Amino acid sequence: MTAEQVHLIARRGAYPGTGSAAQVVETHISWVLLGDEYAFKIKKPVRLSFLDFSTPEQRAFYCREEVRLNRRLAPDMYLDVLSVQPTSSGGWAIGLTDPERPVIDYAVWMKRMDNSRQMDILLRQGAVGPADMAALAALLAPFHRAHALAAGTFVGPTADDYFADFADLFPWATVAQRLLGDAAPRAFETWRPLVLRFIADYHARLHTREQRGFCVDGHGDLHARNIFLLTQGPVVFDCIEFNPHLRRLDVLNELAFLLMDVEAGGRPSLAEDFLKAYLKLWPCIEEQEDEHLLTYFKAYRANVRLKIALLQWEQEQQEAAAQRARQYWGVLENYMAYLALNVGR
């Protein structure tokens, strides 16, 4: 579909529900129509290095995958996959089932949730407590254990892959210098050999963890914005469906995103509460090496967030992006200082 077609559907309310006009939220890979009762996600016809939505058949497949995978943690939120068909009035509608009309695209049908209950918003309001973190751990630990990958069925990234992923930040040294000062490019130069050394020292342990069953077919994008904290319990949504390689990972890498996000938001005690509760349910940290790996993965997740914030700041020069960059820079510096003290030990 095109943006024009999607916006026409939204304006006309041509979808299941009350029929009022919907708000359209656009990302680089999808449009999401937010109605009063429901939300509908339509995938853009794009092919990128990490996904392929270029044909209707591919989009239909990944819509079904999105519903299937997200029902693991949000069964009441992900309702179905609906077809998009032309209407007799010359427009298009979501949810028609007219066998005489062609299906031109597909939409993921979701229950509309209360955005004010998103965890990132609640963290900024100081409205998240230890009980919320315990409830989240009680949801995620059994989920991860149930989706652990058997030894021999998963081959993790190579040492070169790990380094290349982290080193993606380093070409942003000039932008980082403009925003964060001279300390940023100096730190990047220091971190390059540190990361190489760390990966060389710990890659064998990562392989051992694969054999020990600590890699999972998980969520893949586990951060606070993808969590609703509801009265009846947490709902974790919007997992990665389009590339299983981004979803199959060491559980420490999965948890690191959430822990880093909470720590970057200035609530390290809540991160500790979550990890303690989680480890009681699944002791996936067996030795000190694993603690160091968790810090490395937190550093990697902060690295990626910093890079995105630098990109947004360079393009838009907005203070919000600058604040996010400073926020992630702060926690990244702390993680890397910890690794510098422990690498080689």
Model regions: which residues?
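ATP/Mg2+ or Mg2+-diphosphate-binding catalytic cores
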Residues: K307-R345
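Conserved ATP-binding subdomain of kinase catalytic cores across diverse folds
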Residues: A3-H219, A224-V304
